[in-house]
């Protein structure tokens, strides 16, 4: 079965359709609709529909996006795409697309991919960092993604740090 992956970022959505061997059949990039949630849903739905019309065969849909998916509610939280926060994106897309949608944090997707078949495949512990419109991280140990009870394990981009003290930390 073909697989459609969407990498949702603060400024762009990149879509790639892969065949059974992992070869890219089509790649497309569009601006991220980030002003209204309804526009975001329409943009993603239109993109997936374009692929359906062109390839005329079923494919799975997987989405990596900034922010966490609450294990309790399934709603997006902590996203730098503010219109997504509090929304049940998976349910909304599944209803519009009439098919299952896999949804995960983008940094978690990156870290797991590198740990399984990328630069970290020989390592026991892999930390993946994303630097873009926002920043985030994912941690994989023994090929297993760590997400934690709040689905934010590995996230480092929005942590409060203590202030710099020259007498304690030295001069730079």
Model-identified regions with their sequence ranges:
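Conserved phosphate-binding loops in N-terminal lobes of ATP-dependent enzymes
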Residues: 3-65
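Residue-level recognition of short loop/turn positions
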Residues: 9, 21, 72-73, 142
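Residue-level recognition of specific faces of alpha-helices
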Residues: 14, 68, 109, 155-158
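Glycine-rich phosphate-binding loop and adjoining helix at the ATP-binding site
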Residues: 38, 42-45, 49, 57-61, ...
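Glycine/GP-enriched mid-protein hinge/lid loop-to-helix segment characteristic of carbohydrate kinases
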Residues: 2-4, 16-18, 27, 36-37, ...
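Short glycine-rich anion-binding loops that position phosphate/pyrophosphate groups of nucleotides
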Residues: 11, 66-69, 132-134
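Glycine/Thr-rich phosphate-binding loops of Rossmann-like dinucleotide-binding domains
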Residues: 14, 71-73, 137
């Amino acid at each position: 079965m073909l697989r459609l992956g969407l990498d949702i970022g603060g400024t762009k959505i990149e879509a790639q359709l892969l065949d059974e061997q992992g070869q890219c059949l089509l790649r497309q990039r569009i601006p991220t609709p980030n002003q209204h949630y309804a526009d975001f849903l329409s943009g993603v739905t239109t993109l997936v529909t374009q692929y359906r019309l062109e390839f005329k065969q079923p494919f799975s849909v997987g989405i990596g996006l900034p922010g966490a998916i609450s294990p309790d509610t399934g709603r997006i939280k902590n996203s730098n795409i503010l219109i997504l926060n509090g929304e049940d994106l998976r349910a909304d897309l599944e209803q519009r697309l009439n098919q299952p949608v896999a949804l995960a944090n983008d940094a978690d997707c990156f870290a797991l991919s590198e740990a399984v078949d990328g630069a970290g495949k020989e390592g026991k512990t892999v930390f993946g960092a994303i630097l873009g419109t926002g920043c985030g991280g994912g941690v994989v140990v023994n090929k297993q993604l760590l997400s934690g009870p709040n689905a934010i394990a590995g996230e480092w981009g929005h942590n409060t740090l203590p202030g710099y003290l020259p007498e304690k930390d030295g001069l730079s």
